[in-house]
């Protein structure tokens, strides 16, 4: 996907998507997939196909559909797209050398929506985006799980100091798995996703340590893929420097969710009736389920829900705005009390 700043205030908008052509009627199928979503429901807007110009007109905004198999096959200037920010969500190219192909094709910046390999910065918007500088042409927005747990771990570590942590993610199945039993290069992932709970690995531990270097060497992690299409759950088992009660940790996290700089990325719920589908299209990177919190002396367990699709996409958009230097005013303005 390519975004470009435009108009008064340098707002950015989607200019084009680059995809592999799957069929002659590919563009119509893409339009249909945008219009209808089995999880999030129908698109709240209009989608029109301009087949002659290979364009989707989304809410009146033309979005060019460019067919290619590699970034170096496209010259963005040929489509009157200049210095765009490219959001690479293929997961195929994850290091600086391969992602640099976008820069060579005319992009000004590249944001990878997967954990990066090598020395590229892994950024969790709202937590460590302050380490960005203008010379960072290629960065990673980490993963949905990393974005879900890093804000929580950062907040807890700042207040209580984490000695050790085990991260267990109960993750909705993804497109990487098989619908029915079939060959898969990964262990266990070849088994049918809608029928099985699948123990697997998670790359979030390494990425968390990159985003929060103070936790390097203190983390372990694993994942269980489960037969649900969306919304995942991160279970954080933490050993702290000091003892804390359930009431104390919940009160602290509630204040973080409502009254700190993390209030737009951390949610907090206090209902004993909450289940996973209640978090479809949740705008938060993660939501603390306070009724599930466990504490015993210096050990706590936190349950954090996250929409691994919508919530993560919102984080990527926030990071893209940051890279594009777009700051929109918050309305209404806060009232200053004397």
Question: How does the language model describe each region?
Answer:
Residues 185-186, 224-228, 291-294:
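Short, flexible, solvent-exposed loop/turn segments with mixed acidic/basic and small polar residues
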Residues 1-179, 183-190, 294, 318, ...:
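N-terminal Rossmann-like NAD(P) cofactor-binding subdomain of oxidoreductases
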Residues 19-23, 116-117, 143-145, 169-176, ...:
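Glycine-rich beta-alpha junction loops
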Residues 56, 123, 138, 180, ...:
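Short clusters of hydrophobic/aromatic residues that line enzyme substrate/ligand-binding pockets
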Residues 81, 97, 143-151, 165, ...:
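Conserved active-site and cofactor/substrate-binding residues in soluble primary-metabolism enzymes
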Residues 1-4, 101, 151-155, 207-214, ...:
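Alpha-helical scaffold segments in soluble metabolic enzymes
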Residues 161-223, 238:
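Catalytic core of tubulin tyrosine ligase-like
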Residues 221, 233-338:
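C-terminal active-site/capping subdomain that shapes the small-molecule cofactor and substrate pocket
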């Amino acid at each position: 996907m390519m975004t470009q700043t435009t108009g008064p205030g340098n707002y950015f908008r989607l200019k084009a998507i680059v995809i592999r052509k799957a069929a002659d009627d590919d563009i119509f199928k893409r339009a249909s997939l945008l219009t209808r979503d089995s999880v999030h429901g129908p698109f709240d807007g209009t989608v029109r196909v301009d087949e002659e110009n290979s364009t989707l007109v989304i809410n009146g905004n033309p979005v060019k559909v460019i067919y290619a198999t590699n970034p170096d096959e496209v010259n963005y200037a040929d489509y009157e797209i200049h210095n765009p920010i490219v959001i690479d969500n293929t997961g195929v190219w994850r290091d600086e050398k391969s992602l640099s192909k976008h820069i060579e094709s005319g992009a000004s910046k590249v944001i990878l929506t997967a954990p990066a390999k090598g020395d590229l910065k892994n950024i969790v918007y709202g937590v460590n985006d302050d380490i960005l500088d203008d010379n960072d042409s290629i960065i990673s927005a980490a993963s949905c799980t990393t974005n879900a747990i890093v804000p929580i771990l950062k907040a807890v570590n700042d207040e209580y100091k984490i000695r050790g942590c085990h991260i267990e993610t109960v993750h909705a199945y993804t497109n990487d798995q098989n619908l029915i039993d079939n060959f898969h290069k990964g262990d266990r992932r070849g088994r049918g996703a809608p029928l099985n709970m699948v123990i697997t690995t998670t790359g979030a531990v390494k990425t968390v340590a990159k985003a929060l270097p103070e936790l390097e060497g203190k983390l372990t992690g694993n994942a269980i893929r489960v037969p649900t299409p969306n919304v995942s759950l991160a279970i954080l088992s933490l050993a702290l420097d000091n003892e804390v009660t359930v009431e104390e940790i919940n009160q602290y996290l509630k204040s973080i969710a409502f009254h700190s700089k993390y209030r737009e990325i951390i949610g907090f719920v206090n209902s004993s009736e909450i289940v996973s589908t209640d978090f479809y299209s949740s705008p938060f990177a993660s939501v603390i389920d306070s009724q599930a919190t466990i504490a015993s002396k210096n050990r706590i367990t936190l349950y954090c829900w996250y929409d691994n699709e919508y919530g993560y996409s919102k984080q990527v958009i926030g990071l893209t705005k940051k890279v594009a230097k777009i700051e929109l005013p918050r309305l209404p303005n806060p009232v200053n009390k004397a």
